[in-house]
Amino acid sequence: MEKIQIFGARVHNLKNIDVEIPRNSLTVITGLSGSGKSSLAFDTIFAEGQRRYIETFSAYARNFLGGMERPDVDKITGLSPVISIEQKTTNKNPRSTVGTTTEIYDYMRLLFARAGKAYSYATGEPMVKYTEEKVIEMIQSDYAGKKILILAPLVKSRKGHYRELFESMRRKGYLHVRIDGEVQELTPGMKVDRYKNHDIEVVIDRLAVKSPLALSSPSSPDDRLKKSVQIAMKQGEGLIMIMDHETGAVKHFSRRLMCPTTGISYGDPAPNTFSFNSPQGACPRCKGLGYINEIDLDKVIPNRKHSIHDGGIVPLGKYKNQMIFWQISSILAGYECDIKTPINEIPEEALNEILYGTLEPVRIDKELVHTSSDYFVDYDGVIKYLRSVMDDDDSTPTSRRGPSLGSEKWAEQFLAECQCPECQGQRLNREALSYKIWDKNIAELANMDLDELREWLNEVEKHLDKQQQQIAAEILKELRTRLDFLLDVGLNYLSLNRQSASLSGGESQRIRLATQIGSQLVNVLYILDEPSIGLHQRDNERLIHSLKELRDLGNTVIVVEHDRDMMLSADYIVDIGPRAGRKGGEVVFQGTPTELLKTDTLTARYLNGSVRCDSVAAKKTTTDQHLVLTGCRGNNLKGITAEFPLGKLIVVTGVSGSGKSTLINETLYPILSKHFYRSLQAPLPYDSIEGLKYIDKVVNVDQSPIGRTPRSNPATYTGVFSDIRSLFVNLPEAQIRGYKPGRFSFNVKGGRCETCGGNGYKTIEMNFLPNIQVPCEECHGKRYNRETLEVRFKGKSIADVLDMTINQACEFFENVPDILRKIKTIQDVGLGYIKLGQPSTTLSGGESQRIKLAAELSKKDTGNTFYILDEPTTGLHFEDIRILMEVLRRLVDRGNTVLVIEHNLDVIRQADHIIDMGPEGGRGGGTILSTGTPEEVANSDKGYTPRYLKEELERQ
């Protein structure tokens, strides 16, 4: 069958549509936000493919997999096995990294286990190992004619009294042991200091080594020497020590890898030796995380202008008549201060005593505690008190403890992640880090940018010996292949050690895409959700090449996408529209890109240039007010100074990984958030910031959900639901019945339907079949009880209002200004098609972001707000971008500053000011290449953005 055919698709807003998609093609499904693209691609095609796959399992297995409802579609034919690659960052496990997700790190572990060279972590010398025969040969050579002691190591630098060990050795017939370098006779009941570290060896034999000439055959060893070495090897579990009787000098030998100087030995390396998720390889201090949690003094004392009396030390709170405040008062009295002195005026020495405790007991003045005489109390310090809460240290005597500071969870607010001091953030123990290939250990390779790692893999074979080359050849080939797939999808700036939780949705999706290309599957249907998210135009070309490569393997690739280049490179396009929500859900075009350009659909008009995403003209005025951030050096930033002109639309551009998010989301925003709201999020390192006096608040409008449960919706988020409930409560019928605003909430008892708890549906457990949700038989999905629904405004109940689209609600409330003002802003950001009570869990990231923008637009404006948006065009059609730009321009026209991180050229060319970063991603980025108007940046000769921007400006 040459086509995938969908007949009668009616999922969500799809209007009984029929669609044909050619097999073994790259097909783009496009259309306005909310038009039904995802409903067709994911909720129809993917859902049906998944359902058919799961139906092949037994009922017992299906119970564990969860249910897959049949999508509302008449028939789908020609469907292959389906794999969905969505843009969700689902893995929040700190142990998951780019390396573990792609399995590249697994191959790296195998490479080091098979071809790594071991070095001593103590001396840096190459580790050695010996056979019994080699040990005997070296003894005969080095100690010929000398008296020696043959020792078997039993304990290496460990505490304990070892009474049982000594008794066991005595029962085996041994007469002497060597304890901490001193040979002693084994005696009954012998033991050592249990609180000190000890080195213990048992003396296996004392003998004079015969010269090879004195033996009957120079090539055959002395029988006694041979037997003693064998016993020592067995007793010492592969380790043996030879001590010169005359000088006391000791040499170490081992069947295992061993440092010839110190005797430190390693077990044979295995892949788990290099795994930070295994006890064998993980750093013992941080357990393989690379960081530990330490108390952050900036969180304990966030504002040093406050006094201790007024709560300057946050864990203590404001002054209370308690022992700890008496102790602190006593300490401060010795420095001629008191607890009402601002903390920044307290001498450093006094503050250290308050935080970390005193060496001597603190004298408590009798007048403070109303006793007949002064008395002395031990004082451990605020930090010790906090640690006792976190460690739940029940061994700490009650009299020595601080005040009741709450639970461990409460204490966690004063913690900050910091690099593990033992492994320096490398996650592995010192043994694993001591294996090297071409002077690099596995952690150093995992921290390289992927393109740097690829260069290393290209060159490493020249630096291996013949045996290593033979062992490593296949592993290196697999590593290069998998790495190339990641580079092809524009992820060259990442490292294998990058945590999965820190990746954007687009990065996670492209990693999964690279993994799928690497799997070399054929006859599969892949469905991707906007893979171009977060990609610069330069990287986008490589992504398109990768998708075509996936197609050329013999697969069908369906991409939900708005990117111009992606659409024009596709084999086939399905355009869903004509508008969004109830006005969408139809196929307005299906065919080739060439055929699309000849039509008059909204998408075609934008593609052929007859319509553009222009908002009103950019501001040409100059401003004296700037926010200046200097010395930014977090992640890959190279001590840069960034200048942000206020009252303008600023766009930060640059290739993926160039440092945009580091500069804005991890440096600038935390600084502003800490300044205005005392946020505890610490910014990355910087020197100074100037110009804060010109702004009065910061708002980060991101794409995170507006709520985590179906009970949250646009009405509750924007606050308009409170106004609607107030309207209903003031209606005559509600007044007669004595209803309060809570009566019209589906979250509290009173007005909601108690049968379903205000959900509108009930979940039915099906035992060995998937659970199903059915409309509540009492309220029929309306969420409220009958009495509440009897109160009506213009013939509509509260449930009817929540079921209206934003467009319908604007007409309905046209004479209620307070409600209309808030709803109108949602309509203004292009979301007229969503329902007022639509569950937040069903909204896309782009829709959530625009609802947040609408909420900001509805607020009273000071004109000095600093807005930050990270890739707001995600999930947006050209028409949606036009509407978004009008909204952003409105904010700027009020005097606010809007800063956008963006790759979309339709946004970049409309900026008042551009900051272009690069030139490359990762270590090759971190600098500001050019700044200015779009025309000024387009004329720059630095980086990649100017070339693409110039082409875009010439197209106008």
Task: Enumerate the language-model features and the residues they cover.
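Conserved phosphate-binding elements of NTP-dependent enzyme cores
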Residues: 1-956
